[in-house]
Swiss-Prot record:
An example Gene Ontology molecular-function term: sequence-specific DNA binding
UniProt DNA-binding residue ranges: 74-93
Organism of this sequence: Haemophilus ducreyi (strain 35000HP / ATCC 700724)
Annotated family: Belongs to the transcriptional regulatory Fis family.
Coiled coil feature spans: none
Keyword terms of this UniProt record: Activator, DNA-binding, Transcription, Transcription regulation
Subunit structure: Homodimer.
NCBIfam families reported in the protein's UniProt record: PRK00430.1
HAMAP family found in the cross-reference section: DNA_binding_Fis
Protein name per Swiss-Prot or TrEMBL: DNA-binding protein Fis
Pfam families: HTH_8 (PF02954)
Gene encoding the protein: fis
InterPro entries xrefs: Fis_DNA-bd, Homeodomain-like_sf, HTH_Fis, Trans_regulatory_Fis
């Protein structure tokens, strides 16, 4: 279940470290690490549409989880996401979810 977290506590991702201990890291740290890894593999080439790539990697699973949480209720999902229902519908269509 998704829980709203206070602004001072960012979204976190639980992972196991090398010693099999659970470590909670802010989502942004994981995004940074993934981007660092991606950019290091480009061999000096400049990526195109990087913003859209990263946004879609985050937005799609977020929409999926919110729609599951709301049991498909688009009005409730839009309210949770802080967007209007028409925008939500466009995003769902973009990702083949609606």
């Amino acid at each position: 279940m998704l829980e709203q977290q206070p602004a001072q506590n960012p979204l976190t991702v639980s992972m196991l470290n090398a010693q099999a201990q659970q470590v909670n890291k802010p989502l942004r740290d994981n995004v940074k690490a993934a981007l660092k890894n991606y950019l290091s593999q480009l061999n000096g080439e400049d990526p195109t549409e990087l913003y859209e790539l990263v946004l879609s990697e985050i937005e799609h699973p977020m929409l999926d989880m919110v729609m599951q949480y709301t049991r498909g209720n688009q009005t409730r999902a839009a309210t949770m996401l802080g967007i209007n229902r028409g925008t939500l519908r466009k995003k769902l269509k973009k990702y083949g979810m609606g």
